[in-house]
């Protein structure tokens, strides 16, 4: 759905292919450059993304997704690997207007040195060190506003948080994903800096009065680290006493 909006409204994103079965997906690998990115097209708690450095890794990813590792998979996405740095850009919407809601960067790989499998996030900091006024304007004008135009075209009067997952390549933003919620662990670094009562913001969204709310922030940096069970994001023990 997101990629369809990107195509129609010319939102910058990685080139991609969508596949409904293993055979077609594996056939596509023959013409793929590596590394490549393979994504499960369903909810996977942030763990359904594979960065594959060769065809064998890509085949394993395709098999795991279509074999139901993240639930029933009707299709998957194979897309171009963008060599940049990820950033999370948050906005909040009342169906008429929107306001920016700070930025963050999370660290998705399970091991030190950006190694290992992707997770839901092993830690985050806010604001993103990448953000600047020029980049912020590009994100709003090239990605956020066209997306809202696209949603309106589908008859959606969107209200709530929009989490825009971006890859920043030489100060240019490319859309990786959207979530219609705040990110975690990103929210743990963003919300402590919020000075405005969040209930006031939510009420304004419900009543389409967001334009009348002044969202204020403390001028501080914030950082969080995730503690997880041994073995995560694969098989791991739950309900361990800390």
Segments predicted by a language model, with ranges:
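Short beta-strand
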Residues: 38-41, 79-80, 215-216
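Internal nucleotide-binding/catalytic subdomain
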Residues: 48-188
């Amino acid at each position: 759905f997101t990629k369809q909006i990107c195509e129609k409204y010319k939102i910058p994103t990685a080139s991609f292919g969508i596949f409904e079965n293993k055979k077609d997906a594996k056939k596509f690998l023959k013409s793929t450059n590596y590394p490549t990115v393979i994504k499960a097209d369903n909810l996977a708690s942030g763990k359904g993304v594979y960065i594959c450095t060769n065809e064998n890794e890509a085949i394993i990813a395709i098999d795991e997704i279509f074999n139901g590792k993240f639930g029933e998979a009707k299709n998957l996405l194979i897309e171009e690997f963008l060599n940049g740095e990820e950033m999370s850009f948050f906005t909040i919407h009342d169906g008429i207007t929107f306001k920016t809601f700070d930025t963050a960067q999370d660290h998705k790989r399970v091991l030190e040195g950006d190694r290992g499998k992707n997770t839901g996030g092993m830690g985050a900091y806010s604001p993103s060190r990448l953000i600047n006024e020029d980049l912020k304007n590009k994100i709003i004008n090239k990605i956020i506003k066209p997306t809202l135009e696209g949603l309106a075209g589908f008859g959606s009067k969107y209200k709530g948080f929009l989490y825009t997952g971006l890859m920043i390549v030489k100060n240019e933003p490319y859309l990786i994903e959207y979530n219609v919620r705040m990110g975690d662990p990103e929210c743990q670094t963003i919300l402590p800096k919020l000075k405005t009562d969040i209930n006031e913001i939510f009420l304004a969204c419900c009543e389409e009065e967001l334009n009348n709310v002044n969202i204020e922030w403390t001028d501080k940096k914030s950082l969080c680290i995730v503690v997880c069970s041994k073995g995560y994001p694969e098989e791991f023990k739950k309900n361990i006493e800390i």
